Amino acid sequence: MEIAVSFLKSKYDLDDTLKEIDNTSANYIHVDLMDGEFVKEKTNSLEIIASLKKCRKPLEVHLMMNDSSLLEILPSIYDLKPKYIIIHAEIKDPKFFISDIKEHGISVGIAINPDTLVSSISDYIKNVDEVLVMSVYPGLGGQKFIEKTTTKLASLKELPKEKNFIIAVDGGINNETISKVSGLADRVISGSYVCLSDDFENRIESLR
């Protein structure tokens, strides 16, 4: 199982946090960018993007943004050449953005919020490389894992093998909740559990 580390909450400043993650065994740096419209919270996305240019690890960029914000930010994201860009199923036109991201040679993921059904992405699922199940409500770090989201992971796992995407889960992942998603998720995203600790690598290893 792959580990991606989110840095929404950290005991260090942005640059030092990214350096710490870069020096761990994490598979990806998970980048949460928010527009203050799709979710209430807003990140200083351009500052974050500038800092990410120094990172060595592959990037997975999770865009909690509406359609107009996506159109504005995506050119800057493309310049980063991330491995994955994840958009939300709840926006107006996921199909357009899935196509646009793939045209730039970047793997695309689609995220579903805790109250969004797996069936709602049936029209897109054959065209994505990752399905990200949110196990907390998007926007804030440090929330508790929502147990009911494991049923979505199980439903995705049962889909025909020709559906060629990885299953990821994001939110409330720690050494106690990891067992609930083990065997169901191919990738887990952990944030506060890692970045508020004194030893990032130790926390990452506890999830494997």
Which residues are covered by each model-predicted region?
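N-terminal active-site wall of soluble small-molecule enzyme domains
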Residues: 30-100
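Alpha/beta catalytic cores of nucleotide-metabolism and tRNA/nucleoside-modifying enzymes
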Residues: 6, 162-169, 174-178, 182-208
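Alpha-helix-loop-beta-strand connector modules within alpha/beta enzyme cores
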Residues: 43-62, 100-113, 149-171, 207
